[in-house]
Structures are given as structure tokens and as C-alpha cells.
Amino acid sequence: MPTDPKALAYFAAGIGAGLTIMGGAAGIGRLAAAAMEGIARQPNAAGDIRGAMILSAALIEGVTFFSLIVTILLAIK
């Protein structure tokens, strides 16, 4: 049974994109859970924790977006 290489590339890109999204979501989820725990322990540091959480979440989103771009580029090549 012959397999089209383009179809396999799209399939691999879909799997890569899915794993990327799941990894980013898991990372941001763990980040938010740790931030909420930190705020619960020290309510006075809520502003600092929130700022660090937003910055870290943005960095995770950036890496996730970059990885999605790479998977799309690999699929259309």
C-alpha cells in the first residue's frame, strides 16, 4: 500500500502541533497553580507574583507559537 509523503507530513505536523499545544497548556496550568499557591501563602506579594506569572506565561506562549510555526513550515515544505 503506497503512502503519500505529503499526507504523512501533514499527519506529523498535526501530531506535532497537538503536542505543542498540550505542552504549552500544561506549562501555563502548572504556572498558574503555583502562582495561586504562592499568593495564598503570601497575600502581600500578590502583585509581584502576578507580574512574574504574566511574564512567564508570555514566554511559554511565545515558545509554543514558535513551535507551531516550525511545524507548519515543516508541513508545507
Where are these regions (language model features)?
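Hydrophobic, small-residue-rich transmembrane alpha-helices and their short perimembrane loops
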Residues: 1-77
